[in-house]
Regions:
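Conserved catalytic-core segment of nucleotide-activated headgroup transferases in glycan assembly
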Residues: 15-33, 171-174, 182-237, 247-251
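A charged, aromatic-enriched C-terminal amphipathic alpha-helix characteristic of glycosyltransferases
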Residues: 22-26, 30, 180, 315, ...
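Short N-terminal targeting/anchoring amphipathic segment
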Residues: 70-89, 100-102
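Membrane-proximal helix-turn-helix segments that form the acceptor-binding/catalytic region
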Residues: 74, 109-110, 122-142
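Active-site proximal beta-strand in glycosyltransferases
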Residues: 79-81, 94-115
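Donor nucleotide-sugar binding/catalytic pocket of nucleotide-sugar-dependent glycosyltransferases
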Residues: 137-176
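Nucleotide-sugar-dependent
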Residues: 200-207, 252-257, 264-283, 292-301
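Conserved acidic donor-binding segment of nucleotide-sugar-dependent glycosyltransferases
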Residues: 305-306, 310-317, 325-331
Length: 367
């Protein structure tokens, strides 16, 4: 059983389907699907209202059974896997936190005090840390996104063989190419695809990201290129003169925005991100899109290893814009970068850690 969300959003309730526009949902679906593909029986614990939504063969994780949270019989499952702090809190609320084999996946790991690079502060950070304390007591395993996240967890709760590294990933098989979705052609297209947060979730990060995107858009405009933002978050301070906001689209539609862009960019919500990676790096590279990433993410080495882009000095927006133009003009070996991603950073590769863990503990009952 995999657990994440307590309630659907208003948009999801209206559409009667999960709006797969963010990587948290995609990760939930993809890891669940890949475990099922290995022969395990995997159910999704979904909000009660979502359990009554009509079947849709085109929805994400359509083949996986969905069980209303209030109806889950936790003791009937060998393993319960939660996603992020929220997933564990939902498990607690619905009476499953006493299960003997919980795997808790964390995105950001917070410390017992506010620290640089972890964009949760004050009361929000204290609440998340309290959840981590309960996770440590209840969970058989904890998985994190990066070595720095594992190091911080160890600093907080001591070293353990039960803290595992499972970074983000990307689909091995992507939808067939579709029509160009951009409003116009002419200037080089520079894409930032991702969540920029809002007042309810990491408002400090939102302020920094919007400021950097406005600066980058202005600098790119002087160089004859246009910056586009695709994704969710508070865009009220985004400068439309320099940045075109494309809105948030379903995951399956996002691929064509990446395919028809010239460069994908990554900016950091500060001088560095302590332990939360940038999943967009994997996605840009999956379709052979050159990447220019501001230094500071734990996984920006992927750009260098792929040989399809640049990692630039943090805070040097003018230098970043210059590298974007260079990336758009250079002849790259895009197919080599795609092969690198397929060999190292797909969801199939990520689920190997869970598969080995399940084999170790349940070998006699494996399919």
């Amino acid at each position: 059983m995999t657990v994440y969300r307590r309630n659907p959003t208003a948009e999801e309730a209206k559409a009667r389907d999960f709006a797969a526009v963010s990587m948290d949902l995609i990760r939930w679906f993809r890891i669940s699907e890949r475990l099922a593909a290995l022969g395990h029986d995997v159910d999704l614990a979904v909000p009660d209202a979502a359990s009554a939504w009509p079947l849709n063969p085109h929805r994400e994780a359509a083949a996986l059974p969905r069980v209303a949270l209030s109806q889950v019989r936790w003791h009937e499952y060998d393993v319960v896997k939660t996603l992020f702090h929220r997933g564990f809190e939902v498990l607690e609320e619905y009476g499953g936190a006493q299960h003997p084999f919980i795997i808790s996946k964390l995105g950001s790991v917070v410390a017992s005090r506010d620290i640089d690079g972890v964009h949760f502060y004050g009361e929000t950070r204290r609440r998340l840390y309290a959840t981590q304390q309960r996770i440590r007591k209840a969970s058989r395993y904890v998985t994190v996104l990066s070595p720095s996240a594992r190091a911080l967890w160890t600093d907080c709760f001591e070293a353990s063989d039960n803290t595992l590294l499972v970074p983000g990933g990307v689909d091995a098989v992507v939808p067939a190419a579709g029509a160009d979705p951009y409003p116009e052609r002419g200037k080089p297209r520079v894409l930032f695809a991702g969540n920029i947060y809002n007042e309810g979730s990491q408002p400090e990060a939102n302020a920094v990201l919007v400021s950097k995107l406005n600066q980058l858009g202005r600098s790119l405009g002087r160089r004859g290129a246009r910056l586009y933002l695709l994704g969710s978050g508070d865009v009220s301070r985004l400068d439309p003169e320099h940045v075109t906001y494309l809105g948030a689209v379903e995951y399956r539609r996002s691929w064509d925005y990446m395919r028809h862009a010239d460069v994908g960019v990554v900016v950091v919500a500060g001088t560095f991100s302590h332990n939360n990676e940038s999943t967009k790096i994997y996605h840009y590279l999956r379709v052979g899109l050159p990447v220019v990433s501001e230094a500071g993410f734990p996984n920006d080495n992927v750009v260098t290893e792929s040989r399809l882009g640049f990692v630039v000095e943090n805070g040097d927006i003018e230098g970043m814009a210059a590298k974007v133009i260079e990336a758009a003009q250079r002849a790259w070996d895009r197919e080599s970068a795609i092969r690198y991603i397929l060999e190292n950073h797909t969801w199939e590769k990520r689920v190997d850690t869970y598969a080995a863990l399940l084999t170790r503990h349940f070998a006699r009952r494996m399919p």
